[in-house]
Amino acid sequence: IEVPQAPKPPRKPAPNAPQSELDKYNAQLAAHQKAVEAWNRDMKPEADKKTAEFNAAMAKALEPLSPQALRDNRIDAVIFCNTSGALPLPDLEGFANWVKSGGAFIGMHAGSDTLKDSLPFTDMLCGTFDGHGPQVPATLHAGDKEHPANGNIGDIWALSQEEMYLIKNQKRDQVRSVWFMRHHPNKPEEKGFFPVAWVRGLGEGRVFYTTLGHREDLWSTDPALKGRINPVETSNQFRNHLLGGIRWALGLAPGSAEPNPTTN
């Protein structure tokens, strides 16, 4: 989630700086003060809204994901954002137990292409990456349009272009479908149930996963983004989808985790 940042003040010149540097600093300071006024008026409310409920940090190593570190640092949720492969977590079974004891796990896109041969992880996620074809337009159907992870999008979500995953090993009686497809766009001749996003309760914990998130124009709301195919409206819908799922996983938004295996 991109949070607007407050303007930074100019660096003060040295005490013995020449008058030209002092004049430049004073001009920059005046411009900064105007920028702060504009920030407080136009941007600060949005920034406060986005940071009021939770803080986020990026882990550059795996040690912070040990169960003990998660407890010691009072971490409420872990996000696998486009991770892939056999991540050497310090204690994978302990990590799954941390979720069961009240933690939250959130996976995005290639998060299901992670630890595919590790039973504690695949059992926790309840769905495994099984390949994808070329990027295509896709029509998504809501499994639960009242759930926060629906993003207030409604019954149908039309994507102009995305890399749509195939998912295997999902026990539908253990998850609540949030978004799914009735036809996979890479295999339009096949009718069925193709998971896109789901949630589940796991012991005292919660899991939210979405297969979406490959294209940059889903993440970015920059209308001038090079190569944009999805409109900015879709980018905002994607953000609402993610933020709704994160808030639900953290217990900040109500929503059911009751499995809905007959949804089609």
Feature-to-residue mapping (PLM):
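Non-transmembrane alpha-helical segments in soluble domains
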Residues: A96, T122, N150, L243-R247
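Solvent-exposed loop/turn segments at secondary-structure junctions
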Residues: T83-L87, F105, G111-L115, D155-W157, ...
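Sec/Tat-exported extracytoplasmic proteins
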Residues: I79-N82, G103, I153, A249-A253
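Residues at alpha-helix caps and immediate loop-helix transition turns in enzyme cores, especially N-
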Residues: P90-D91, D117, G192-F194
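Extracellular ligand-binding/catalytic regions of CAZymes and related secreted enzymes
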Residues: K8-A38, D42-F54, P185-F194, G201-N264
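Glycine-rich, charge-decorated loop segments at or immediately adjacent to ligand/cofactor-binding or catalytic sites
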Residues: D113-L125
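Catalytic beta-strand/loop cores that center a nucleophilic Ser/Cys/Thr
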Residues: Q33, E37-K50, F54-E63, G127-T211
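Helical hinge/lid and interdomain linker segments adjacent to catalytic or ligand-binding clefts
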Residues: I1-G107, G111-T114
